[in-house]
Amino acid sequence: LTNYEPVIGIMGKTGVGKSSLCNALFAGDISPVSDVAACTREPLRFRLQVGDRYITLMDLPGVGESGARDTEYAALYREQLPRLDLVLWLIKADDRALTVDEHFYHQVIGEVYRHKVLFVISQSDKAEPTSGGGQLSTAQKQNISRKICLLHELFQPVHPVCAVSVRLQWGLKVMAERMIKCLPREATSPVVSQLHPSFRTTVVREQARSDFGETVGAVLDSISAFPLIPAPVRAVIQAVRTTVVSVARAVWDFFF
Protein backbone atom coordinates (compact mmCIF):
# COMPACT_ATOMS: atom_id res chain seq x y z
CA LEU A 1 0.00 0.00 0.00
CA THR A 2 2.77 2.44 0.86
CA ASN A 3 4.62 1.74 -2.40
CA TYR A 4 1.72 2.38 -4.78
CA GLU A 5 2.78 4.62 -7.69
CA PRO A 6 -0.14 6.71 -9.01
CA VAL A 7 -0.39 7.67 -12.68
CA ILE A 8 -1.99 11.03 -13.49
CA GLY A 9 -2.71 12.17 -17.03
CA ILE A 10 -2.48 15.87 -17.90
CA MET A 11 -4.57 16.70 -20.95
CA GLY A 12 -4.85 19.96 -22.85
CA LYS A 13 -4.14 21.83 -26.05
CA THR A 14 -0.77 23.40 -26.84
CA GLY A 15 -0.06 26.37 -24.58
CA VAL A 16 -2.69 25.48 -21.99
CA GLY A 17 -0.07 25.49 -19.22
CA LYS A 18 0.35 21.82 -18.33
CA SER A 19 3.99 22.05 -17.29
CA SER A 20 3.57 25.24 -15.28
CA LEU A 21 0.60 23.78 -13.38
CA CYS A 22 2.50 20.59 -12.53
CA ASN A 23 5.54 22.57 -11.40
CA ALA A 24 3.28 24.71 -9.20
CA LEU A 25 1.46 21.77 -7.60
CA PHE A 26 4.24 19.28 -7.00
CA ALA A 27 7.38 19.63 -4.92
CA GLY A 28 9.77 17.94 -7.35
CA ASP A 29 11.10 19.36 -10.60
CA ILE A 30 9.34 18.33 -13.80
CA SER A 31 11.05 18.54 -17.17
CA PRO A 32 9.47 20.88 -19.74
CA VAL A 33 7.13 19.19 -22.20
CA SER A 34 8.13 19.46 -25.87
CA ASP A 35 5.51 20.85 -28.24
CA VAL A 36 7.07 19.17 -31.28
CA ALA A 37 4.24 17.49 -33.19
CA ALA A 38 6.00 14.14 -33.53
CA CYS A 39 6.33 13.87 -29.76
CA THR A 40 2.58 13.81 -29.22
CA ARG A 41 2.01 10.51 -31.04
CA GLU A 42 2.90 8.66 -27.84
CA PRO A 43 2.18 10.12 -24.41
CA LEU A 44 5.26 11.55 -22.72
CA ARG A 45 5.82 10.24 -19.21
CA PHE A 46 7.57 11.97 -16.34
CA ARG A 47 8.43 10.17 -13.12
CA LEU A 48 8.35 12.53 -10.19
CA GLN A 49 10.26 11.61 -7.03
CA VAL A 50 10.17 13.12 -3.56
CA GLY A 51 12.15 11.04 -1.08
CA ASP A 52 11.36 7.40 -1.83
CA ARG A 53 7.89 8.16 -3.21
CA TYR A 54 7.06 8.27 -6.91
CA ILE A 55 4.20 9.34 -9.13
CA THR A 56 4.06 9.22 -12.91
CA LEU A 57 2.69 12.16 -14.88
CA MET A 58 1.56 11.41 -18.42
CA ASP A 59 1.29 14.26 -20.93
CA LEU A 60 -1.78 13.61 -23.05
CA PRO A 61 -2.39 15.57 -26.28
CA GLY A 62 -5.35 17.91 -26.44
CA VAL A 63 -7.99 17.44 -29.12
CA GLY A 64 -9.35 19.93 -31.61
CA GLU A 65 -6.01 21.22 -32.91
CA SER A 66 -5.74 18.77 -35.80
CA GLY A 67 -8.67 16.83 -37.22
CA ALA A 68 -6.31 14.29 -38.76
CA ARG A 69 -4.80 13.56 -35.35
CA ASP A 70 -8.01 13.37 -33.30
CA THR A 71 -8.86 9.86 -34.52
CA GLU A 72 -5.34 8.76 -33.63
CA TYR A 73 -5.66 10.40 -30.22
CA ALA A 74 -8.95 8.62 -29.59
CA ALA A 75 -7.19 5.26 -29.94
CA LEU A 76 -4.37 6.47 -27.70
CA TYR A 77 -6.81 7.53 -24.97
CA ARG A 78 -8.75 4.28 -25.11
CA GLU A 79 -5.46 2.46 -24.57
CA GLN A 80 -4.24 4.64 -21.71
CA LEU A 81 -7.42 5.41 -19.73
CA PRO A 82 -7.56 2.06 -17.89
CA ARG A 83 -4.02 2.70 -16.58
CA LEU A 84 -4.70 6.19 -15.25
CA ASP A 85 -5.82 7.07 -11.74
CA LEU A 86 -6.93 10.55 -12.81
CA VAL A 87 -6.98 12.85 -15.84
CA LEU A 88 -6.56 16.59 -15.32
CA TRP A 89 -8.28 18.07 -18.39
CA LEU A 90 -7.01 21.63 -18.78
CA ILE A 91 -9.02 24.20 -20.75
CA LYS A 92 -7.78 27.76 -21.15
CA ALA A 93 -10.00 30.46 -19.72
CA ASP A 94 -10.17 32.17 -23.11
CA ASP A 95 -10.72 28.98 -25.17
CA ARG A 96 -14.11 29.08 -26.87
CA ALA A 97 -13.56 26.26 -29.39
CA LEU A 98 -14.93 23.40 -27.31
CA THR A 99 -17.13 21.50 -29.77
CA VAL A 100 -14.48 18.85 -30.48
CA ASP A 101 -13.65 18.60 -26.76
CA GLU A 102 -17.30 17.97 -25.95
CA HIS A 103 -17.63 15.28 -28.62
CA PHE A 104 -14.39 13.61 -27.52
CA TYR A 105 -15.44 13.59 -23.87
CA HIS A 106 -18.81 11.98 -24.52
CA GLN A 107 -17.66 9.54 -27.23
CA VAL A 108 -14.18 8.50 -26.04
CA ILE A 109 -14.13 9.12 -22.29
CA GLY A 110 -17.78 8.11 -22.00
CA GLU A 111 -19.60 6.80 -18.96
CA VAL A 112 -16.90 4.27 -18.15
CA TYR A 113 -14.11 6.74 -17.42
CA ARG A 114 -15.80 10.09 -16.76
CA HIS A 115 -15.24 9.63 -13.02
CA LYS A 116 -11.49 9.83 -13.73
CA VAL A 117 -11.67 13.33 -15.25
CA LEU A 118 -11.21 16.60 -13.35
CA PHE A 119 -11.73 19.67 -15.53
CA VAL A 120 -9.44 22.61 -14.77
CA ILE A 121 -9.83 26.09 -16.25
CA SER A 122 -6.23 27.24 -16.63
CA GLN A 123 -4.71 30.70 -17.04
CA SER A 124 -7.70 32.33 -15.36
CA ASP A 125 -5.79 35.62 -15.37
CA LYS A 126 -6.40 35.68 -19.14
CA ALA A 127 -10.17 35.75 -18.69
CA GLU A 128 -11.80 38.89 -20.06
CA PRO A 129 -11.38 41.71 -19.30
CA THR A 130 -7.63 41.14 -18.99
CA SER A 131 -5.69 43.63 -16.91
CA GLY A 132 -2.27 42.05 -16.31
CA GLY A 133 -2.52 43.06 -12.67
CA GLY A 134 -1.58 41.18 -9.55
CA GLN A 135 -5.05 39.82 -8.85
CA LEU A 136 -8.24 38.89 -10.64
CA SER A 137 -10.82 41.62 -11.07
CA THR A 138 -14.45 41.18 -10.06
CA ALA A 139 -15.41 41.10 -13.73
CA GLN A 140 -12.86 38.36 -14.44
CA LYS A 141 -14.16 36.27 -11.54
CA GLN A 142 -17.70 36.65 -12.86
CA ASN A 143 -16.61 35.49 -16.31
CA ILE A 144 -14.73 32.55 -14.80
CA SER A 145 -17.91 31.58 -12.92
CA ARG A 146 -19.79 31.68 -16.23
CA LYS A 147 -17.10 29.50 -17.81
CA ILE A 148 -17.44 26.98 -14.99
CA CYS A 149 -21.21 26.87 -15.54
CA LEU A 150 -20.66 26.42 -19.28
CA LEU A 151 -18.31 23.47 -18.76
CA HIS A 152 -20.79 21.84 -16.38
CA GLU A 153 -23.49 22.28 -19.01
CA LEU A 154 -21.39 20.94 -21.90
CA PHE A 155 -19.62 18.06 -20.18
CA GLN A 156 -21.83 17.24 -17.19
CA PRO A 157 -18.73 16.15 -15.25
CA VAL A 158 -18.73 13.94 -12.19
CA HIS A 159 -16.47 16.31 -10.24
CA PRO A 160 -16.76 20.09 -9.77
CA VAL A 161 -14.81 22.16 -12.31
CA CYS A 162 -11.74 23.97 -10.92
CA ALA A 163 -10.26 27.28 -12.04
CA VAL A 164 -6.65 28.31 -11.46
CA SER A 165 -4.04 30.89 -12.33
CA VAL A 166 -0.48 29.74 -11.80
CA ARG A 167 0.85 33.25 -12.46
CA LEU A 168 -1.28 34.69 -9.66
CA GLN A 169 -1.13 31.54 -7.48
CA TRP A 170 -4.93 31.66 -7.46
CA GLY A 171 -7.22 28.65 -7.00
CA LEU A 172 -4.39 26.13 -6.60
CA LYS A 173 -5.18 25.17 -3.01
CA VAL A 174 -8.83 24.44 -3.82
CA MET A 175 -7.77 22.49 -6.89
CA ALA A 176 -5.32 20.37 -4.87
CA GLU A 177 -8.06 19.50 -2.38
CA ARG A 178 -10.49 18.53 -5.14
CA MET A 179 -7.83 16.52 -6.94
CA ILE A 180 -7.17 14.43 -3.84
CA LYS A 181 -10.90 13.77 -3.42
CA CYS A 182 -11.11 12.58 -7.05
CA LEU A 183 -8.31 10.03 -6.75
CA PRO A 184 -8.91 6.36 -5.92
CA ARG A 185 -8.24 5.65 -2.25
CA GLU A 186 -4.94 3.84 -2.81
CA ALA A 187 -3.54 6.83 -4.74
CA THR A 188 -4.29 9.72 -2.39
CA SER A 189 -1.46 9.26 0.12
CA PRO A 190 1.34 8.89 -2.47
CA VAL A 191 0.08 11.99 -4.31
CA VAL A 192 -0.19 14.03 -1.10
CA SER A 193 3.44 13.20 -0.33
CA GLN A 194 4.41 14.78 -3.68
CA LEU A 195 2.42 18.00 -3.30
CA HIS A 196 4.12 21.30 -2.61
CA PRO A 197 4.02 21.79 1.20
CA SER A 198 1.66 24.78 0.93
CA PHE A 199 -1.00 22.51 -0.60
CA ARG A 200 -0.78 19.78 2.04
CA THR A 201 -3.67 21.35 3.91
CA THR A 202 -5.56 19.79 6.81
CA VAL A 203 -8.35 18.85 4.40
CA VAL A 204 -5.89 17.14 2.05
CA ARG A 205 -4.05 15.28 4.81
CA GLU A 206 -7.21 14.08 6.54
CA GLN A 207 -8.65 12.83 3.25
CA ALA A 208 -5.47 10.85 2.59
CA ARG A 209 -5.39 9.54 6.16
CA SER A 210 -8.99 8.34 5.93
CA ASP A 211 -8.42 6.77 2.51
CA PHE A 212 -5.34 4.93 3.77
CA GLY A 213 -7.34 3.44 6.63
CA GLU A 214 -10.16 2.40 4.31
CA THR A 215 -7.67 0.84 1.89
CA VAL A 216 -6.21 -1.23 4.72
CA GLY A 217 -9.74 -2.24 5.66
CA ALA A 218 -10.48 -3.26 2.07
CA VAL A 219 -7.38 -5.48 2.08
CA LEU A 220 -8.61 -7.21 5.24
CA ASP A 221 -12.03 -7.67 3.65
CA SER A 222 -10.43 -9.29 0.61
CA ILE A 223 -8.42 -11.65 2.80
CA SER A 224 -11.43 -12.67 4.89
CA ALA A 225 -13.45 -13.32 1.72
CA PHE A 226 -10.84 -15.73 0.37
CA PRO A 227 -12.50 -19.18 0.12
CA LEU A 228 -9.63 -21.09 1.74
CA ILE A 229 -9.56 -18.95 4.90
CA PRO A 230 -10.80 -21.05 7.88
CA ALA A 231 -13.95 -19.73 9.54
CA PRO A 232 -12.24 -19.03 12.92
CA VAL A 233 -9.53 -16.97 11.18
CA ARG A 234 -12.17 -15.11 9.19
CA ALA A 235 -14.00 -14.29 12.41
CA VAL A 236 -10.81 -12.92 13.98
CA ILE A 237 -10.07 -10.75 10.91
CA GLN A 238 -13.59 -9.33 10.97
CA ALA A 239 -13.38 -8.71 14.71
CA VAL A 240 -10.14 -6.73 14.55
CA ARG A 241 -10.93 -4.83 11.32
CA THR A 242 -12.10 -1.62 13.00
CA THR A 243 -9.08 -1.56 15.32
CA VAL A 244 -6.61 -2.18 12.49
CA VAL A 245 -8.17 0.59 10.39
CA SER A 246 -7.92 3.00 13.33
CA VAL A 247 -4.27 2.10 13.86
CA ALA A 248 -3.55 2.57 10.14
CA ARG A 249 -5.00 6.08 10.29
CA ALA A 250 -3.01 6.84 13.43
CA VAL A 251 0.33 5.83 11.89
CA TRP A 252 -0.31 7.53 8.52
CA ASP A 253 2.17 10.32 9.30
CA PHE A 254 4.91 7.75 9.86
CA PHE A 255 4.51 6.35 6.35
CA PHE A 256 3.71 9.55 4.44
Spans of model-derived segments:
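Short glycine-/polar-rich loops that comprise or flank the Walker A/P-loop
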Residues: 53, 82-87, 113-117, 156-160
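Canonical P-loop GTPase G-domain recognition
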Residues: 125-193
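N-terminal low-complexity/disordered regulatory or targeting extensions
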Residues: 1-9, 13, 33, 143, ...
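Membrane-inserting effector segments that mediate pore formation, membrane fusion
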Residues: 209-256
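Catalytic P-loop NTPase motifs of RecA-like helicase/translocase cores
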Residues: 64-65, 96-97, 127-128, 195, ...
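Conserved G1/Walker A P-loop phosphate-binding module
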Residues: 1-60, 247, 254-255
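Switch II of P-loop NTPase G domains
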Residues: 40-43, 60-87, 91-110
